[in-house]
Amino acid sequence: MTNIRKTHPLLKIVNNAFIDLPAPSNISSWWNFGSLLGICLILQILTGLFLAMHYTADTTTAFSSVTHICRDVNYGWIIRYMHANGASMFFICLFMHVGRGLYYGSYTYMETWNIGVILLFATMATAFMGYVLPWGQMSFWGATVITNLLSAIPYIGTNLVEWIWGGFSVDKATLTRFFAFHFIFPFIIAALAMVHLLFLHETGSNNPTGISSDADKIPFHPYYTIKDILGALLLILALMTLVLFSPDLLGDPDNYTPANPLSTPPHIKPEWYFLFAYAILRSIPNKLGGVLALVLSILILILMPLLHTSKQRSMMFRPISQCLFWILVADLLTLTWIGGQPVEHPYIIIGQLASIMYFLLILVLMPVASTIENNLLKW
């Protein structure tokens, strides 16, 4: 009799995706981040669900309800901090996952890559709306500043912003709708992640060499299930270390002050994982130009398959491209640092140079380097 996992309509799907899936024999730990993102998403949905049981999406009680969760609810403090720091772990895994895709040329799987970019946008939107919910000073002013960027859109901008706010400023209506969206979005992300996997399994995984691995496949289980479990344990270790030893390390002290529309914090800044984009936004003196640069800084990922000029898929055997890739990583770290600094000399000029460097590397230097490498190989 055939094994039930190969015949049952539901189990067959699970089997083909996680058990008998043919996987390349040489994929490294950089391929662990997909499963880690899945774990992060499940963790965020579960902790978020329990937080939503005690949270009230109303301007008068939102801040108090979060305090109540931390003080009075059984293990509420750990659920709250796991959710807040879980978002940070989520973005660390996201950046690693995207970086892996860029380095090893995974973006040549167009459908998988484009859905991944949509997933990145959806996750960023979800995290932004979640940051508004505790209704602290940085929640309120972050929401005001970021939503206000849409007013830079010609003709419809002001109407659009007021439509999103549900009034003439960030208020009760804004908080309520942000809570509704923050609740529904993770499920949309989960659905998109399944489509992401569906398209990936049409082609099979890429591998570090960028060469077809059809001649050398191994079953996903037990080899990569055990590898993913190790990755998951390390992720949980890192998360719980953060939660139990320094839960506020990545947060903003201003968010422990209840939202006050009459008092602006001296430095309005988003969570650390948005700082690189915030630095690019601030580096352009023009409002519309800044907003366009902000959107393009992420949207540029969609162009990666078009900018690929190399005859090799992966950067594994391309030293010039490798150097440029790590310069890009350093540049993004520089932008992250600048995004958290006040708008004054020398930070302004450093931010502007780093922003120019970011677009220059992706749009010009890396495609040129690939062409040079092609010629060096005399192919």
UniProtKB/Swiss-Prot annotation:
Binds 2 heme b groups non-covalently. It is found in: Mitochondrion inner membrane. GO terms for molecular function: metal ion binding; ubiquinol-cytochrome-c reductase activity. InterPro entries: Cyt_b/b6_C (IPR005798), Cyt_b/b6_C_sf (IPR036150), Cyt_b/b6_N (IPR005797), Cytb/b6-like_sf (IPR027387), Cytochrome_b (IPR030689), Cytochrome_b_C_euk/bac (IPR048260), Cytochrome_b_N_euk/bac (IPR048259), Di-haem_cyt_TM (IPR016174). One of its GO terms (biological process) is mitochondrial electron transport, ubiquinol to cytochrome c. Pfam families: Cytochrom_B_C (PF00032), Cytochrome_B (PF00033). Its main location: mitochondrion. It is a multi-pass membrane protein. CDD domains: cytochrome_b_C, Cytochrome_b_N. One of its GO terms (cellular component) is mitochondrial inner membrane. Keywords: Electron transport, Heme, Iron, Membrane, Metal-binding, Mitochondrion, Mitochondrion inner membrane, Respiratory chain, Transmembrane, Transmembrane helix, Transport, Ubiquinone. The chain crosses the membrane at residues 33-53, 77-98, 113-133, 178-198, 226-246, 288-308, 320-340, 347-367. Heme b b566 binds at residues 97, 196. A ubiquinone binds at residue 201. It comes from the Eukaryota. The cytochrome bc1 complex contains 11 subunits: 3 respiratory subunits (MT-CYB, CYC1 and UQCRFS1), 2 core proteins (UQCRC1 and UQCRC2) and 6 low-molecular weight proteins (UQCRH/QCR6, UQCRB/QCR7, UQCRQ/QCR8, UQCR10/QCR9, UQCR11/QCR10 and a cleavage product of UQCRFS1). This cytochrome bc1 complex then forms a dimer. Belongs to the cytochrome b family. Component of the ubiquinol-cytochrome c reductase complex (complex III or cytochrome b-c1 complex) that is part of the mitochondrial respiratory chain. The b-c1 complex mediates electron transfer from ubiquinol to cytochrome c. Contributes to the generation of a proton gradient across the mitochondrial membrane that is then used for ATP synthesis. Heme 1 (or BL or b562) is low-potential and absorbs at about 562 nm, and heme 2 (or BH or b566) is high-potential and absorbs at about 566 nm. This is Cytochrome b. It comes from Cephalophula zebra (Zebra duiker).
